[in-house]
Structure formats: C-alpha cells, structure tokens
Curated annotation (Swiss-Prot):
One GO biological process term: valyl-tRNA aminoacylation
Family the entry assigns: Belongs to the class-I aminoacyl-tRNA synthetase family. ValS type 1 subfamily.
Keywords associated with the record: Aminoacyl-tRNA synthetase, ATP-binding, Coiled coil, Cytoplasm, Ligase, Nucleotide-binding, Protein biosynthesis
Subcellular location: Cytoplasm
Keyword Zinc: no
Entry note about domains: ValRS has two distinct active sites: one for aminoacylation and one for editing. The misactivated threonine is translocated from the active site to the editing site. The C-terminal coiled-coil domain is crucial for aminoacylation activity.
Locus of motif 'KMSKS' region: 520-524
Subunit structure: Monomer.
Motif 'HIGH' region per UniProt: ranges: 44-54
Gene source species: Staphylococcus aureus (strain NCTC 8325 / PS 47)
Gene Ontology MF term list: aminoacyl-tRNA deacylase activity; ATP binding; valine-tRNA ligase activity
GO CC term, one of those recorded: cytosol
Gene it is expressed from: valS
Entries under InterPro entries matching the protein: aa-tRNA-synth_I_CS, aa-tRNA-synth_Ia, Anticodon_Ia_Val, M/V/L/I-tRNA-synth_anticd-bd, Rossmann-like_a/b/a_fold, tRNA-bd_arm, tRNAsynth_Ia_anticodon-bd, Val-tRNA_synth_C_sf
Protein name: Valine--tRNA ligase
Length: 876
C-alpha cells in the first residue's frame, strides 16, 4: 500500500473506522477458550456533544481494550449513553420555551416524545464523535439507560430494595431547585462563594427580661423557627435553658433548648432552629420532637405560613423582613459575609434546603458491605491508590440517598397509591386493578440507573444471559476522580448487593482537562476546546496521543495546542522513518523473508536490544496504567534510537555492495518497524494501520495483530555499551565542529585516544559509523595518540576525542569573531540584569514574565561562559 510523501491525517483516517466496524474487528472473539477483558463505557449524557474530558476518558479506555485485544484476550468494549434526567429535560424545556411552550402545555406523553427525539439526534452526534476518535466499540451491544433491558433492571432493583426495607419513603431535607421544581442530588449542586451578609437579630425573652442574639445568613427562614438551641456546656446560657423567647414579627413562643451540636465559639453561641429549611436543623428537630414549619412553596415563594409575606419571592421577603425588623429595633448589626451558596448546575437557581416527602435509599448497610469488601481478596484496586482513602472516607460518612426527582424524563418510580385508601403498592408490574391506583409521578435519580450500568448492560437480571455470565465482572472502570462519590461508589454497592461480586477489578481515575493556564474550561470563560476541531486540524492520532501521555493517573491535564502540534510532528517523524524503511525494504520483501539469524551488525544488535527493552517497559507500564511514562518510552525509542540513529546507520549497509548485509538490514528494519507499529497502535490506531498495511505483514488488520513479545535471543547487552561509546564520540565531534564554526560537510582530521586496547579494537571494528557521522579527512584510533598543542579535546567514556586546530581555522579571525559574540552576550546579560533589578518591574510583572527573564539570563550566562572558555582555549 502506497505511502504518500507527506503525512495527511485526513487522508490516513478517511474511511478507515467504517472499514473496521464493517468487518467486525471490534466484536468479541468467537474463541471462548480465551480469557475475557471487558470495559463498559461510562455513558455520556445525551445532552449535547462530547467535550475534551470525554475524549480523554474514552481514549484511555480504547488504548486499554485495543492492547488487550492484541494480547489475545476476548475483548469487549461496550458502548452506551445516559438519559441524564434533569440535564436533558432542561435542554428540551429550553428548546420548547423558545417556541413559547412549556412542558405542561404539552403534557407528559407529548413532552416525552420531544425528549426521545432529542435523544436520537444527540446520540447520532455522539456516535459520529466516537468514530472520529477511533473507539473500538461493539455497536451491536450499545445500550441506553432508558432502554427496555435497563428499565427491567431498574424496576427489579427498586422493588428488591423496597422489599428489604432499604428503599423507603419519608420526609427529609433535600436540595430543591425552585426554578426546575425538582430535588437535586449533591453532584447537581455547584457551590460558589457569594458576597452576602450575616444578620444579627434580637429574639426577646418572653418574660420581657432582655433578649438573646441570633445570627443568620437567611433571615426569610426565621419565619419557620421552632426553637433556639445553646450548648449545655456554655456558661453564658446555663440559666436560660428552659426559658422561651418571642419569634420577631410572627410572635410565636420558642423554647430555648440544650444541644451539643452548637459551637460555643461561633457567633453568639445561640442558634435558631428551622427544621424544615436546614439539614442540621432538621436533625436537631428530630432529636427534640420539634414541629416542621415549611414557609416556602416549590417555586421559592413564601407560603401562607409566612403571614404577611405570603406570595413574595424568598429574596424579596428577606429584604422586606430585615426592613421591618429594623423598624422594630430588632436588628443588632449586619456584617458583610462571603459564604458558599449552592446553585443548581442546570438552572443556575440558588438551591433551597427544603423539607419534602421523597424516596430514599438507606445507606448504612450498603456502605458497610462496600467497606468490608475492600478488606477481602475481591477488593477493588484504585489507581492511584490514594483514592481508595477518598472512597472509604465517603462511605464512612454517607447519608441516605434521595432517589426521587420531580421530572418526567427518566425511570418512573414503580410505586402506585390506592386512590381511596392511600395504600402504597411497589412492584415490577402495575397492579391488576390499575383503575384504582395512581402511579407515583416522580422519576428516579439518573444515578440510580447508571449505578447498575456494569451489569445491567450485560443482560442482568437474566442470570443466564451469555454476556452476563462471560463478561461480568468487568475488568476496569476509567473515569474522572470528580465522580467517585456519585457514580463509582454507587456502582460498587449496587454490584455487591445484586451480583455478590465487585462490578470491576480496577478503577483508573483521571483528573479534569484544564485550559493551558490551569483554569477550568467553561463557556463563560470562552476557553473551551472542541475535540472535533482538534481532530480536523491535527488528526485523531495526535489528539489521542496527547491526551493519553500528557498526564499521570489522578492528575489534571492542561490542554496545549503546542503539545498537540508536537505530537503531530512526532507522527511526521514516524511517517518519514517508515517511508525510508519501506523504500529500502522493497515491495517484494515478504514476512517469510525476515531473517534475524544472519550476520547482525552492531547497529542491528543495538536497535533490537533497545526494541526489546522498550517492549518490556511499555507492557509493564501499561499494566500499571502509567501511560504518560509509556509515551516517554515510545517517544525516546522511536525518535532518538530508531529514526535519528538506526535509520541513519542502516544507510551504511544499504549503500554498500554487500547483498547479504543488505538483506539482514531489511529484516531488522521490517521487524523493528512492525513492532513499533504494534506498540503504537493502541495510541495511534489510524496511522499505524496505514503504515502496517504497507509493511510485510500477516492478517487483515493491525487491530487483530498480536502484541509484541520480548525475544531474549534478540537482546545483545554488549551492543548497548559499544553504541553508547560511539554515540558519545559522534556527539562530541559535532559539538566541537559547532564551537569552531566548521560545518559537517567539511572533512577534518580526527584523533581518538582510546582508554585501553579493548576499546581501541571495538572502535576500530566499528569505524564505519564514525566515518559516516563525523566525516573525517583522517581518523586515527589508538591508545597512544599524540595530542597536538593546538587542539580541541573532549573527554568521553572511551577516552579522548581530539580535533587538531592547525590549518582548520584562522586563529586570529576566530578569536575576533568569538570576542564580538562575547560582547553581544554581555550586553544581553546587562539588559536582563537591569530588568530584574528594577523593583517596579519585579513587583508588577506577572510571575510568568519574570520567570521567562530569569530563564533568558541563565541561557545567556551559559552561552557567555562557553564562548569565553573557547577563547581561552584558542589563546592557550
């Protein structure tokens, strides 16, 4: 297959993915004797197109599964998408609002039709993006969290947990979005620091003897106060415990109670209790059997319990209430106060802690089982390991999980209420006398269905499902560390509860993709990057390699166009190296022609040794998910060892008349390049397929090729030392040429004083490499080389490299040139010194700019010292 002179990612990638999918290369093996390897894709939300975080996440999964497929595993990489309840519903509602329509205008059934249309549209976008990224997914098994099979699993889990008493219906404080009018999970609440106020009010004692000071950031909630609490150990209030105060404006009498929850040192040490509008107050209220008074409705407006403030927006009520309290001389002070306020991730509304009747999952026993499992052989391994502590900490401090949502898009709760008796029926099927029952209108939290993802996608609850029996538990979960609590932990406890097994063996956690300056990517900052735009510019392979190798497990990744471009340059280097190799291998060279048992040269032995070392390193690091280190190992071997050194060295035999040596070189080129393509393939699937198809090969595709194996017979340890000596000599000569301003094209005499006779023999046997790379007019290698008076001498491992200067350069002219260069460097040093000693510059300039000037100074100083040393050497 022809390789064009220039690497063009568009040409290389065009049609390739469709060919892979059409030929079924990503389907699991039909050989059931193979060990399985499974990853189920973390399902992206059907709310929109994929971002860089998704690209990073799925690239890592694809690298792992491609590698395992090549290593002979029966590999399944299963695709799917999440209905993303509130997020998708918000998008669909926004679209309807543009037409002046609400979901209530349409009704539930028609609205859900609109939501399904949205899902189909965005699912096709997501599939197209998966294709552009080159993900090796088995589309015949694609799942969706609302499809029939998963709905069956969701109903079974809900009913089973209800029957076990783990799911219950009750009153709790939940996160309430008054704009979307639904409960929110903790992950759907974004906390932001907001400039607010701390209001200090007087609550007069009922006996008229003074007042108690109360501070709050939410004055509107005081209308629902039912008690004041103080710490029983607080000497200031020991005498008032049991007394009562009058709730300002309302006139209700509130008891003063003792509770150790109160922080003696915070504020006045006395705290108002509003059980219906604060989670901590609710717990206090439960302990003291306080009344729950809800003073707002679901829209965030004050209700009839708020008296004269009924109908007002909560924030308007706050202003009016403070004004009224001032008029009654009940305001002590108002302090500016920055505090963390929860906002709905979807609507942006300030979240209201709100007492509501919801469905909950009782978490204590489920969490305990998850923690206990981490002490067994069936434990889940976290990469990095430190995140296991994060997981354990959360499980130890877990609260019951609110699972009901006041939405239409999602799994409707399988609970029905009898129209006359109010009896609750929970079942996988509706009651037979359905006309007497009303189904709960709420849907389940999106995380409830996605918590079942590893096993519901494989056919559970059908325990006889072939996929479930063969591919569960899965092998690895790759996801962001930001959803350990909300997804990873829930999959673990649901997997253990319903399958008695961990849902995955390993959890590989990565960070967030950030902008180059370290800030979070966001629409408001305008610093987001569309991965598809990057692919259009540089190709999928460039983006994939950057994402995979640009960070280490558990750390954030800073996106950099410059670094993506450097990967593109790396691929160009590979492309050019492959083209040279293929031109020398020749079209008639076949796999069976590869013979590595012949008379291998030093360069052949060295590159084969380095190849085997790289295979071992890449395999070992990949097993530990250290893809950043893998990237460095591959880059160093391919760019430096293979392209810069071996390819150049291979020109010696290829330009000779020795046909036997040419054939050996062709074998080494072909074998090495083939193994490079195989190692690179999981990272760069498109370009490696293109090059591999042009190489002598067996099989239809590199996707199904075997992973490279270390061959002990092709490791020649002694070749590394000899090559190291030669490379050091070559680099030394080249550096000396630069220093005396003599181009490589000009032949010069070179003397090498070998450290001992053994080195002298080794260098003499391999002098062809020195002749090719150093271009000497004469080359003298000996232990007793006489060093001329005027010469440049470099000390190397093998001895000394000497360049006689007599006749090579005009000494006076060269000294004059170097002195002018020294003067220029001195002037640059003076300029930078002046800048860095300027207090005005140092105090006002950004740190980045200051560091850049310091770097320049260091560079100039190093150059200055080098030029000065050369002048002294020439004058000596």
């Amino acid at each position: 297959m022809e390789m064009k002179p220039k690497y063009d990612p568009r040409e290389v990638e065009a049609g390739r993915y469709e060919e892979w999918v059409k030929n079924g290369y990503f389907k699991p093996s039909e050989d059931k004797s193979k060990e399985t390897y499974t990853i189920v894709i973390p399902p992206p939300n059907v709310t929109g197109k994929l971002h860089l975080g998704h690209a990073w996440d799925t690239t890592l999964q694809d690298i792992i599964t491609r590698m395992k497929r090549m290593q002979g595993y029966d590999t399944l990489y299963l695709p799917g998408m999440d209905h993303a309840g509130i997020a998708t519903q918000a998008k669909v509602e926004a679209k309807l609002n543009e037409q002046g329509i609400t979901r209530y205008d349409l009704g539930r059934e028609k609205f859900l039709e609109q939501a399904w249309d949205w899902k189909e549209e965005y699912a096709s976008f997501i599939r197209a993006q998966w294709a552009k990224l080159g993900l090796g997914l088995d589309y015949s098994r694609e799942r969706f969290t609302l499809d029939e099979g998963l709905s069956k699993a969701v109903k079974k889990v809900f009913v089973d947990l209800y029957n076990k008493g783990i799911i219950y219906r009750g009153e709790r404080i939940i996160n309430w979005d008054p704009k979307a009018r639904t409960a929110l999970s903790d992950i759907e609440v974004i906390h932001e620091d907001v400039q607010g106020a701390f209001y200090h009010f007087k609550y007069p004692y009922a006996d008229g003897e003074g007042f108690i000071e109360i501070a709050t950031t939410r004055p509107e909630t005081m209308l629902g106060d039912t008690a004041i609490v103080v710490n029983p150990n607080d000497e200031r209030y020991k005498d008032v415990i049991g007394k009562t105060v009058i709730l300002p404006i309302v006139g209700r009498e509130l008891p003063i109670l003792a509770d150790e929850y109160v922080d003696i040192d915070f504020g006045s040490g006395a705290m108002k209790v509003t059980p219906a509008h604060d989670p901590n107050d609710f717990e206090i209220g439960q302990r003291h059997q306080l009344e729950n008074i809800i003073v707002m409705d679901e829209n965030g407006k004050m209700n009839d319990k708020a008296g004269k403030y009924e109908g007002m927006d909560r924030f308007d009520c706050r202003k009016q209430l403070v004004k009224d309290l001032k008029e009654q001389d009940l305001v002590i002070k108002i302090e500016d106060h920055v505090h963390s306020v929860g906002h709905s991730e979807r609507s942006g509304a300030v979240v209201e802690p709100y007492l509501s009747t919801q469905w909950f999952v009782r978490m204590e026993d489920l969490a305990k089982r998850s923690l206990d499992n981490q002490k067994t052989d069936d434990r889940i391994d976290f990469y990095p390991q430190r995140f296991e502590h994060t997981f354990n900490q959360w499980m130890e401090n877990i609260r019951d999980w609110t699972i009901s949502r006041q939405l239409w898009w999602g799994h409707q709760i399988p609970a029905w209420y009898h129209k006359e008796t109010g009896e609750i029926y929970v079942g996988e099927e509706a009651p037979t006398d359905i006309e007497n029952w009303q189904q709960d209108e709420d849907v389940l939290d999106t995380w409830f269905s996605s918590a079942l993802w590893p096993f519901s996608t494989l056919g559970w609850p059908d325990l006889e499902s072939e996929d479930f029996k063969r591919y569960y538990p899965t092998n690895a979960l790759v996801t962001g560390y930001d959803i350990i609590f909300f997804w990873v932990a829930r999959m673990i406890f649901q997997g253990l509860e319903f399958t008695d097994r961990r849902p995955f063996n390993d959890v590989l956690l990565h960070g967030l993709v950030r902008a180059e300056d370290g800030r979070k990517m966001s629409k408001s900052l305008g610093n987001g990057v569309d991965p598809m735009d990057v692919i259009d510019e540089y190709g999928a392979d460039s983006l994939r390699y950057f994402l995979a190798t640009g960070s280490s497990p558990g750390h954030d990744l800073r996106y950099s166009t410059e670094k993506v471009e450097s990967v593109w340059n790396f691929i160009n280097k590979i492309w050019n190296g492959a083209r040279f190799s293929l031109m020398n291998i020749g079209e008639d060279f076949k796999v069976e022609d590869i013979d590595l048992s012949g008379n291998l040269s030093l360069a052949d032995k060295w590159i084969l040794t380095r190849l085997n070392e790289t295979i071992a390193t890449v395999t070992d690091l990949s097993d530990k998910y250290e893809f950043g280190e893998v990237g460095r190992a591959l880059y160093n071997f391919i760019w430096d060892d293979f392209c810069d050194w071996y390819i150049e060295m291979s020109k010696i035999p290829m330009n000779s008349n020795d046909e036997e040596q040419k054939q050996v070189t062709r074998s080494v080129l072909s074998y090495t390049l083939d193994n490079i393509m195989r190692m690179l393939h999981p990272f760069m699937p498109f370009v490696t397929e293109k090059i591999w198809q042009s190489l002598p090969h067996e099989g239809d595709t590199i996707v199904k090729a075997s992973w490279p194996e270390v061959r002990e017979s092709l490791i020649f340890e002694e070749s590394k030392q000899t090559m190291q000596q030669l490379v050091e000599i070559i680099k030394s000569v080249r550096q000396s040429r630069v220093e005396v301003n003599t181009p490589l094209s000009k032949e010069i005499p070179i003397l090498i004083q070998a450290k001992d006779k053994e080195i002298e023999t080794t260098l003499s046997q391999n002098k062809d490499y020195l002749i090719k790379f150093c271009n000497p007019s004469t080359l003298n290698i000996s232990t007793d080389v006489e060093i001329p008076e005027k010469a440049m001498t470099s000390v190397v491992i093998a001895g000394k490299v000497v360049l006689p200067l007599e006749g090579l350069i005009d000494m006076d002219k060269e000294i004059s040139r170097l002195e002018k260069e020294l003067a220029k460097l001195q002037s640059e040093l003076d300029r930078v010194d002046k800048k860095l000693s300027n207090e005005n510059f140092v105090s006002k300039a950004p740190e980045k700019v200051i560091n850049e000037e310091k770097r320049k100074k260091q560079d100039y100083q190093e150059k200055y010292d080098g030029v000065k040393a050369r002048i002294e050497q020439l004058k000596a």
